[in-house]
């Protein structure tokens, strides 16, 4: 059996595959030692979902563990509104919709449908301004669906030993930059 891919790692892998390694390395440390203020704020904003206190509506399912056998993915959903058959991925602040956000939502979608839930709508919600962004279902966006499957294939064959980051902006914005021997930002 192949190793399971954690759904949240889909977005992390796109940003920088090495960040997943560092996240696991520092994972047991106090996050104040290595997380940026934006990440700490995002984690804090997510507490109501993780603690299942975001809503008291019976139709609101929060922080549900999910698994997709087809894609070998596991993780948690943020919010499923069973009365509307709506799956929602919440983000602290959305400036633009990145592919990684969509891929996380697709992974949750496949896991939910494999587990027997009906999902008719996908949304990304920006928590700071309460804006909702409707995302096409995978079957209605074959290009993004293909990119999703390609990303999973890349993750399964990835070799950290041969990886070198090519985007200096990612290094400049990485919380692990000081610890990373692959950073393009050395000496600045």
PLM feature segments, named:
Residues 13-14, 20-22, 29, 108, ...:
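Broad hydrophobic/π-residue packing in well-ordered secondary structure
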Residues 33-37, 44-52, 111, 132-136, ...:
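Short amphipathic alpha-helical patches
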Residues 39-40, 105-107, 137-138, 151-152:
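Short, charged/polar low-complexity linear motifs in solvent-exposed/disordered segments
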Residues 90-98:
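Short beta-strand-loop-alpha-helix junction that forms the active-site gateway
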Residues 101-112:
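Short, charged, amphipathic alpha-helix that recurs within catalytic cores of restriction-modification
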Residues 1-87, 103, 185-188:
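Metal-dependent nuclease catalytic cores that hydrolyze phosphodiester bonds in DNA/RNA
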Residues 86-90, 132-134:
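Short small-residue beta-strand/loop micro-motif enriched in glycine and branched aliphatics
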Residues 58-70, 96, 114-188:
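Metal-dependent nuclease catalytic regions and adjoining charged, substrate-binding loops involved
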């Amino acid at each position: 059996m192949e190793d399971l891919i954690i759904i949240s790692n889909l977005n992390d892998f796109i940003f920088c595959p090495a960040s997943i390694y560092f996240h696991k390395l520092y994972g047991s440390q106090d996050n104040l030692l290595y997380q940026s203020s934006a990440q700490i704020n995002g984690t804090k904003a997510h507490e109501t979902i993780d603690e299942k206190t975001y809503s008291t509506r019976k139709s609101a399912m929060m922080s549900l563990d999910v698994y997709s056998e087809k894609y070998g993915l596991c993780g948690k959903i943020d919010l499923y509104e069973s009365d509307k058959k709506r799956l929602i991925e919440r983000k602290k602040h959305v400036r633009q919709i990145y592919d990684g956000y969509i891929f996380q939502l697709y992974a949750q979608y496949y896991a939910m449908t494999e587990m027997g839930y009906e999902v008719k709508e996908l949304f990304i919600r920006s928590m700071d301004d309460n804006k909702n962004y409707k995302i096409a279902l995978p079957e209605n966006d074959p290009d993004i669906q293909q990119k999703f499957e390609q990303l999973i294939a890349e993750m399964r064959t990835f070799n950290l030993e041969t990886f070198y980051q090519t985007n200096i902006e990612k290094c400049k914005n990485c919380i692990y930059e000081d610890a990373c021997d692959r950073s393009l930002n050395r000496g600045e």
